[in-house]
């Protein structure tokens, strides 16, 4: 049985989030949560929340052993980019891209 959680329009860079997501994929839920809890960057906190949501979704299914769940897949897609401008010297301006991410976590029952 699989469980899924999706977080859209998260204000974290998709590139940096994928670096953290690669470390979590294939781990047991408890081990993945401990890893994310003590990883000192913003994407880890966002992924931790999505993982908790997927775990809560799994517990609602019924007949599922939540402790035996494994992180089957973590998909990080790029969301829309917010464009901002920063004033610079001599009347110029520089474009700043604030990137967003769509994060999907899929849990499955099974062995690590």
Swiss-Prot record:
InterPro entries: Ribosomal_uL22 (IPR001063), Ribosomal_uL22_bac/chlpt-type (IPR005727), Ribosomal_uL22_bac/org-type (IPR047867), Ribosomal_uL22_CS (IPR018260), Ribosomal_uL22_sf (IPR036394). It comes from the Bacteria. GO terms for biological process: translation. One of its GO terms (molecular function) is rRNA binding. It holds the Pfam family Ribosomal_L22. SUPFAM superfamilies: Ribosomal protein L22 (SSF54843). NCBIfam families: rplV_bact. Belongs to the universal ribosomal protein uL22 family. This is Large ribosomal subunit protein uL22. It comes from Desulfovibrio desulfuricans (strain ATCC 27774 / DSM 6949 / MB).
């Amino acid at each position: 049985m699989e469980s899924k959680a999706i977080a859209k329009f998260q204000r974290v860079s998709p590139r940096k989030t994928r670096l953290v997501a690669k470390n979590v994929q294939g781990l047991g839920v408890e081990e993945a949560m401990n890893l994310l809890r003590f990883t000192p960057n913003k994407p880890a906190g966002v992924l931790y929340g999505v993982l908790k949501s997927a775990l809560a979704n799994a517990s609602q299914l019924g007949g599922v052993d939540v402790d035996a769940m494994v992180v089957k897949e973590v998909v990080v897609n790029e969301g829309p980019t917010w464009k901002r401008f920063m004033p610079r010297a001599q009347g110029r301006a520089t474009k700043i891209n604030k990137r967003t991410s769509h994060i999907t976590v899929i849990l499955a029952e099974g062995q690590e």
